[in-house]
Amino acid sequence: MGLKLIAFDLDGTLAPSKGPISCEMAKALKSLLDITQVCIISGGTEQQIMSQVVSKLPAGANLRNLHLMPTSGARYLKRHFGRWRTVYSEDFTPAQAERIISVLHVSAALLGVWPDNPYGEVIDNRGSQITFSALGQDAPLEEKEAWDPDKSRRDQLRRTVASMLPEFDVRSGGSTSIDITRLGIDKSYGIYELCKRTHISPDSILFVGDRLEPGGNDFPVIGTGVDFQHVFSPEETLVLIRNLL
């Protein structure tokens, strides 16, 4: 294999939104970790990556070859002496977080997308990223898919919030969510940091994701010089991995 590292988005790429990877995906990732380095760079939290992916990998998976980048690359964790260690975390200040949360409340109310009966938290302060979920963090997948099938409501919210927060990066996350990080802290930042710290050049990396459209949280990766593959489901990703093995 000419590639030295394969980087994956999580929701919609390796697994359904907020769901675990399949048994077939877990086996395929274990096989991939045996032959190359793998990075998971997701808008989700460290806990979500651990729950959805790491905890589902078969015993004996080579975790030394696994890099974790939660919150869209704003954090980086690496296995060190049998434990996950934080390499960096680009967190908001309390004042920044307060301003972002205030703008999200105002924008969602203005556009009529604040839910009356949310499934869990609507605004999730993840330290290095703040995520707005239009139906709540724990909404069923079927309801999320039905809420905004053409993505117009989510994209309108993203544009509105971005216009009010020009000093931050605002991107589409999952099917009903938008993600906000510090300016310049996105998945391209994560890829650049990964290259710098692993000494792997961008042309030796393949990125796989389902939000590579402009405004999507995978889109910044396109400008980094890595090869990239747009997928539309975890099933498609599984086929891609098997073809790489």
Report residues per predicted region.
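A general structural motif
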Residues: 1-3, 35, 63-65, 127, ...
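Asp-based phosphoryl-transfer active-site loop
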Residues: 2-19, 40, 68, 191, ...
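Conserved acidic, metal-coordinating active-site core of Asp-based
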Residues: 115-206, 217
